[in-house]
């Protein structure tokens, strides 16, 4: 899975995902499925904001890469991918400037056109179930929620999908491609199934002798980037317990 992530995603996204995991004591080389999940979420956030600008009249326009429109204002502020301190600094600045209510949890984006924060979710389950879980957690009508799935489904607050159909189709196509590429490498089942992931992790760790370089301290903290992906992948408490149960050198 680690090789797939490094081949499939932009190096900048990979680097940001590594930093996010390491900040919370998580090892991308061990928790490779989580690594892939964070990269996927980051890429969706970046694709969401790509090519979208606000012109001098305050209207939202789409400008393809390479067009000479440097004076245009980006429609979306990307919050996801920043370290927590900087992310909250950006959020506070936006709230002070616009008067928008400060969110309880770090959102992923801010939409300058609609003047609202956006929470992006990526899931393989029923989108409406994940949407309700996300809404129940956030408990704020001020934060707009937009959920994507690997099957091409989506759900958004009040059926307001923010982006044009073509931009959303680009994201859906990318998610479908990731799924197909994982499946072709035999990685998809373990990526979405905790039971299969447990079996694969046990198999991988048994093949490592001696147990050199494996982490001794197990983290029970959940990284912000991963929270938006649950339950696409196991939460860190379950992952940590699983990892702790298998990080034992085989008896001679």
UniProtKB/Swiss-Prot annotation:
GO terms for biological process: viral RNA genome replication; viral translational frameshifting. Its main location: host cell. The keyword Flavoprotein does not apply. GO terms for molecular function: RNA binding. It is found in: Host cytoplasm; Host nucleus. Keywords: Decay of host mRNAs by virus, Eukaryotic host gene expression shutoff by virus, Host cytoplasm, Host gene expression shutoff by virus, Host mRNA suppression by virus, Host nucleus, Host-virus interaction. The active site is at 80, 108. The record marks 202-203, 206 as: Important for efficient shutoff activity. It comes from the Viruses. The record marks 195, 198-199 as: Important for efficient shutoff activity and nuclear localization. Belongs to the influenza viruses PA-X family. The probable endonuclease active site in the N-terminus and the basic amino acid cluster in the C-terminus are important for the shutoff activity. The C-terminus acts as a nuclear localization signal. The C-terminus is recruited to host protein complexes involved in nuclear Pol II RNA processing. Plays a major role in the shutoff of the host protein expression by cleaving mRNAs probably via an endonuclease activity. This host shutoff allows the virus to escape from the host antiviral response. Hijacks host RNA splicing machinery to selectively target host RNAs containing introns for destruction. This may explain the preferential degradation of RNAs that have undergone co- or post-transcriptional processing. This is Protein PA-X. It comes from Influenza A virus (strain A/Chicken/Scotland/1959 H5N1). The gene is PA.
């Amino acid at each position: 899975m680690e090789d797939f992530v490094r081949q499939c995603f932009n190096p900048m996204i990979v680097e940001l995902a590594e930093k996010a995991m390491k900040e919370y004591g998580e090892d991308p080389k061990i928790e490779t499925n989580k690594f892939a999940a964070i990269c996927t979420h980051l890429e969706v956030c970046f694709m969401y904001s790509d090519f979208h600008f606000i012109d001098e009249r305050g209207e939202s326009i789409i400008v393809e890469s390479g067009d000479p429109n440097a004076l245009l204002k980006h429609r979306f502020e990307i919050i996801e991918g920043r370290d927590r301190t900087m992310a909250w600094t950006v959020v506070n600045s936006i709230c002070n400037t616009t008067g928008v209510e400060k969110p309880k949890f770090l959102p992923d984006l801010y939409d300058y056109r609609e003047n609202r924060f956006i929470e992006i979710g990526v899931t393989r389950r029923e989108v409406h179930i994940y949407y309700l879980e996300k809404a129940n957690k956030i408990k704020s009508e001020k934060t707009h929620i937009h959920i994507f799935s690997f099957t091409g489904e989506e759900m958004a607050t009040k059926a307001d999908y923010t982006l044009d159909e073509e931009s959303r189709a680009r994201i859906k196509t990318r998610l479908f491609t990731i799924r197909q590429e994982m499946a072709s490498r035999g990685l998809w089942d373990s990526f979405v199934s905790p039971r299969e992931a447990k079996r694969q992790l046990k198999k991988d760790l048994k093949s490592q002798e001696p147990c050199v370089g494996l982490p001794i301290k197990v983290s029970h903290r959940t990284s912000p980037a991963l929270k938006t992906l649950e339950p696409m992948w196991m939460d860190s408490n379950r992952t940590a317990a699983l990892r702790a149960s298998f990080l034992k050198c085989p008896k001679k």
